[in-house]
Every structure is written in structure tokens, then in C-alpha cells.
Regions:
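N-terminal module-boundary/linker segments of secreted carbohydrate-active enzymes
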Residues: 1-63, 68-75
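Substrate-binding cleft of extracellular glycoside hydrolase catalytic domains
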Residues: 63, 67-181
Length: 181
């Protein structure tokens, strides 16, 4: 596959470089999905209630998308996550996507570190490579569906396997080699 950056992605990269030399962008996880004493209210945000505007970055977790579920591990419908990513883009903000995927070897959650061969099992030739490739395809299809009504692909910051220098996730530092990671 050849990957070509869209003009929107190029614009995002340029803006991130510009911001990094002047300051930072404030973010909040699931900001428009739930907050203190509310859940699912359209357009609501605790950050906006306190500060007068939405955060520059809103993060969402794609966990359970790989399983074909309609709800994320945070119990948010993926259809709402998609809608909120598009809303954030329309406001000029950035959406960050994490993916606390299940442990493909044991069936446990991301924090199941009971086996040190999970990463090895998803690599080409591994027992769970095909399963993992299918999971990646589901996430890829979701990200590719993030388009405006005019067909513009919405750029996102995708951060799978984050916090890899710790060992609390099955992809963590003590659970695989740097080459496997």
C-alpha cells in the first residue's frame, strides 16, 4: 500500500509544529460523551462549561471495536464517537484515538499481562496474526469512515499501544522485545 497524506493531514501537521513552538493544546478524554452528573447529552462538555470552549484535543478509545461491539469499553456507542470526532473537526479541534484492545492470546483485557508471548503471537507467522490483522482491519475501516458530508477525510492522531515503556499492558516493555514491539 502507498499512503498519501491528505491536505487536511498536512495542515494538521503544520499546525502541530506551530503550536509546539508556542505552547500546548489542552485535551480531555471523552469530553463530549459524559461528565460530572451527565452522560450522552448532545454538545455538552464539562470543559466548555468551566472554560467557555471545547478542549483543543478530545480523545476517544476504540476498545471493543475489534470485537465487533457497538459500544466502546467506556460504554459509548461507536456511532456517537464517530459523530463527536466529526463535530470536533468542524470546530477546528483535534481528535486523538487510543485503542485498549483485548489480549488476542488470552482473551483478557489490555491489562492482562499473564503471558509474555502475546506480541510474538500477533506477528507474521504467529498463532494470532490473522485474528490481529482482522482487528486492525476493523479499526482501519472505522478511521476511514471519518469523513465530512463533502467526503473530506478527517485526520486523527492514532495512538495504539501507548504507554509501552511501562509493563501494565500486554504490549509493554517487559512483555516483548524492542524488535517485536
Amino acid at each position: 500500500n502507498t499512503f498519501v497524506r491528505t491536505p487536511e493531514t498536512e495542515h494538521l501537521l503544520a499546525n502541530l509544529k506551530k503550536v509546539s513552538s508556542r505552547g500546548f493544546m489542552f485535551g480531555h478524554h471523552d469530553d463530549t460523551n459524559y461528565g460530572i452528573g451527565w452522560e450522552g447529552d448532545e454538545g455538552r462538555s464539562d470543559v466548555k462549561s468551566v472554560c467557555g470552549d471545547y478542549p483543543a484535543v478530545i480523545s476517544f478509545d476504540l476498545a471493543h471495536l475489534e470485537l465487533g461491539d457497538t459500544l466502546s469499553r467506556d460504554k459509548v456507542p461507536f456511532s456517537k464517537i464517530r459523530r463527536e470526532i466529526l463535530n470536533q473537526y468542524k470546530r477546528g479541534g483535534l481528535s486523538s484515538l487510543s485503542w485498549h484492545l483485548r489480549n488476542p492470546l488470552t482473551g483478557g483485557d489490555s491489562w492482562d499481562v499473564s503471558d509474555t508471548t502475546v506480541v510474538k503471537s500477533i506477528l507474521p507467522g504467529g498463532a494470532n496474526h490473522e485474528k490481529f490483522a482482522g482487528w486492525v482491519s476493523k479499526v482501519s475501516a472505522f478511521i476511514n469512515s471519518l469523513q465530512t458530508e463533502d467526503g473530506v477525510k478527517v485526520p486523527v492522531l492514532f495512538r495504539p499501544w501507548h504507554e509501552h515503556t511501562g509493563s501494565w499492558f500486554w504490549w509493554g516493555e517487559k512483555l516483548c522485545t524492542p524488535e517485536e514491539y
